[in-house]
Structures are given as structure tokens and as C-alpha cells.
Amino acid sequence: FLLSIYIAFSKYGDIVLGEKGEKPRYSFFVWGSMMFTCGLAADILFYSFSEWVMYASDPHIKEMGSIQQWAGVYPLFHWSLIPWSFYLVLAVAFGFMLHVRKRNRQKYSEACRPLLGKYTDKWPGRIIDLLAVFALLAGTATTFSVATPLMATIIQDLFHLTVSRTAINIVILIITCIVYTYSLLHGFKGISRLANLCIYFFFGLLAFVLLFGGQARYIIETGLNSLGTMVENFIGLSTFTDPLRSTNFPQNWTIYYWAYWMVWCVAAPFFIGSISKGRTVRQTILGGYVFGVGSTLISFIVLGNYSMGLQMHGIADFMAQYAKTGDLYGMIVDIIK
């Protein structure tokens, strides 16, 4: 994170990712929509609603204080500045490689050419690319394993389907592949249209929950409190390692998330760098924080505090439901209802 801020405000921040005087291909909104949907969108509905529930029963949260004070802080910490700093630092590096150096081979080995030299095209470069492919497969599998069952559960409950959840999962994956292929065949234009559609639906959902969910005051006040607590304790949260392993919280959550974001660094930064042609390094980094981090924070503040508000006001008991069944997908469906 500190490295990204240094790059943005140093002399390197004025470097244009492209030819001198070249203008961005996309408007800020379209560019931000594409960046956000490529970075976090697949998992964000799942974790926005439910992550605080998983934290609420963790001994570390009880050590720190109340559920009200801390259960909503860690989602903001885990999903905001640090993951986006991973993406954005690499995005400007790849953007420089693609648009300034004109090296159009989007491979990790190509990014290592200044270090590997002639060995980039030999077995060291191939090993790097192979590891990147395995990392991408692991990240994709993790994302689909979280997002697809949730969609299947919602569809099954909404339409009262009697077929198995596995069959619905397969259908969803097939439809996803078709939509993805269609978008790719139409290039970045197709991807931008799909991203715009997704972002309109997404912010429409947030507006609906905030305005008509009955928890608006709680959402805003708790959200501001959690955001302030996260900013105030950012360094401590970032460096906590639980050396005595009293709860294993950073190992189970913080380090897991960092590893997950690093896995997606084999793909997301290449895409962000590709669509950032014509923007300066500073615009790419700060714009990424404004749109990427801003949208992420709003999502967790609205959706997470909506479900936590229902819990705190005695309207529902999601903590007891999760402790009894362990079914986060069914719990999220009940939250949405």
C-alpha cells in the first residue's frame, strides 16, 4: 500500500501508460466498472452479507471487544486497501510494459525479462508461466466455489426447484462460460458493456437495501464507526500475527486473504493495465483506489450492516442459525428475504 502511494505521488506518477498526449479510451465510470468487476465482484455479494457472522463467533473478536464494534471492521480491512494495492502496483507495471515498452505478450515471464534476459524464453520463463497458470486455476476454482453455490441456492429457493443444487451449479457454470465467451468475442467493448450492466444492477441493489431495508440509520452510523476504527487501527491490524497462536485469527483469515489476492495477481493486474492505456500512473493508482476501494467499502457497509442490523435489533438470529446449520448460503437467502 505504501509503495503504491509513493509511486503515485513521485515523479513516476506523471508517466503516461501509452504515447505522450494519448487520451484514455474509456470514461472514468466505464473504466472503474471494468476494473471493479474484474477485481472483486464475483465474491463480494457472498462475503458482504455473511463475513461478519463468521467473525462474530471467533475468539479474537471477543478478545478485542464487542461484536458491534469489531465484526464489521475486519471485512473492510481485508477487502479494501491491501488487496487493491496488490492489484494496482502490478497494474501500472504491466501497463507500462504493454503500452510504453510495447511488449504485448501478457505473460509473467515477460514481466521478468529485465531480470531473466535470454532465459525468459527458456525453462525458467516457462516455469514462471506454469506457476502463474496453476495460481489462476486455483483462484478461479475458489471464486466459483464461493459464488456459484450461492446463486444456485437463490435460484432454487426463488423458483421452488426440486432439482439438486449440483445440477443448478452446472447450468450456472455453462451460462457463465457462454456469457464470458460472448464478451471475449466482442473484445473490450463487450466486456465494458457487461461490466456496466453488472455495476448498475449492483448499485441498484445497494440503493434498494439502504432505502427500503429498514436499517438505514444503523447502516450509516455503524458503517462510519467501522470505517473510522479500521483507519485508526490499520497498522496494528496489518501487523498482528498472533505469535502465541491463541486464536490463529491472522493465519485463518488475514494471511488467507493475502494469499488469495496474490493468486489473482496473475490475472487482474494485466487486465487493469490493459484498459488503463492513456492514463497516467497516478490516475491509475488513485482512480483504482477511488472506484475499487470505494465500491468495495460501500458494499460491505450497506449489505454487511444491513444483515448485522437485523441481528442486533432482534429481527433475526443469523449467528444462531449459522452455529446450528453451518450453511452460509441458506443464511444469505434468509437475509435477502
Cite the ranges covered by each PLM segment:
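Membrane-interface loop-to-helix entry segments
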Residues: 1, 128-136, 142, 185-212, ...
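N-terminal alpha-helical transmembrane segments of multi-pass membrane transport
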Residues: 1-67, 85, 207, 211
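Hydrophobic alpha-helical segments and their helix-loop junctions in multi-pass secondary transporters
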Residues: 2-11, 51, 141-158, 203-241, ...
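Membrane-water interface regions at transmembrane-helix termini and the short interhelical loops
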Residues: 5-23, 72-79, 93-104, 153-159, ...
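Transmembrane-helix boundary/entry motifs in multi-pass membrane transporters
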Residues: 18-37, 70-82, 106-138, 160-162, ...
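Select transmembrane alpha-helical segments in multipass membrane proteins
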Residues: 30-38, 87-91, 122-138, 170-177, ...
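Transmembrane alpha-helical segments of multi-pass small-molecule transport proteins
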Residues: 159-185, 204, 258-270
